[in-house]
């Protein structure tokens, strides 16, 4: 069992490297997932990262924590660390874009956005990891993706780190706005009970 878990964790890193347009210790910018070999598609991986992938066209089937899903155009898949991910069929015309964040970095960005709604969004996404976006929301995701990719691969500058952090924080708010058609996010009330709740949730990320 330990060997099986170790192989799952090893393959998750190897697979992400094969579809990476950019990678460092904190973030991986993903490109074509259909570059993954057929053997790897059917091998489960234990994700050791926060993952966000948008389907641009085509279809794919997959299993998340032993639950089957289909992803199509404008579907956004968000997975949290330790999700058991298994690819099924990936269409020849399947195209996607997205990124991975290390758990430590994702936690820092998550907390920096300072919204109590983050926790409600997280709980919802754990039960509903795939959400459908409209064309405008998908275009917005691609804009964030392209800007992140551009900034990460450009010549480093003094405020690059702060800029990347700000872009990812803005992305979190955009996703929360997109989720309002699915769930009613509660207004943020900054009081002692919410502060305790947020502190407790930080320990769980």
Language-model-detected regions and their locations in the chain:
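Generic protein-terminus/edge-of-domain signal
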Residues: 1-70
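A hydrophobic/aromatic-rich effector-binding and dimerization subdomain
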Residues: 7, 18-21, 88-153
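Amphipathic, well-ordered alpha-helical segments in soluble domains
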Residues: 51-54, 140-147, 167, 171-174
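Histidine-centered metal-chelating micro-motifs
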Residues: 77, 81-87, 106-107
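Short, Lys/Arg-enriched, Trp-marked, Pro/Gly-tolerant hinge/linker segments that flank
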Residues: 132-135, 155-164, 175-205
């Amino acid at each position: 069992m330990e060997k099986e878990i170790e192989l799952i964790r090893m393959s998750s890193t190897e697979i992400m490297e094969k579809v990476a347009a950019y990678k460092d210790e904190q973030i991986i910018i993903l490109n074509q997932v259909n570059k993954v070999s057929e053997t790897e598609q059917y091998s489960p991986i234990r994700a050791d990262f926060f993952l966000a992938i948008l389907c641009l066209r085509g279809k794919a089937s997959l299993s998340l924590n032993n639950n089957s899903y289909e992803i199509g155009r404008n579907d956004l898949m968000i997975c949290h660390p330790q999700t058991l991910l298994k690819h099924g069929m990936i269409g020849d015309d399947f195209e996607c874009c997205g990124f991975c964040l290390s758990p430590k970095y994702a936690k820092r960005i998550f907390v920096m956005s300072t919204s109590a709604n983050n926790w409600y969004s997280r709980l919802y996404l754990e039960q509903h990891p795939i959400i459908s976006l409209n064309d405008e929301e998908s275009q917005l995701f691609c804009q964030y993706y392209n800007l992140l990719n551009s900034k990460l691969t450009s010549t480093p500058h003094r405020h690059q780190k702060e800029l990347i952090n700000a872009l990812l924080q803005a992305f979190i708010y955009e996703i929360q706005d997109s989720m309002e058609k699915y769930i009613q996010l509660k207004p943020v009330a900054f009081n002692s009970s919410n502060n305790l709740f947020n502190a407790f949730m930080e320990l769980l990320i």
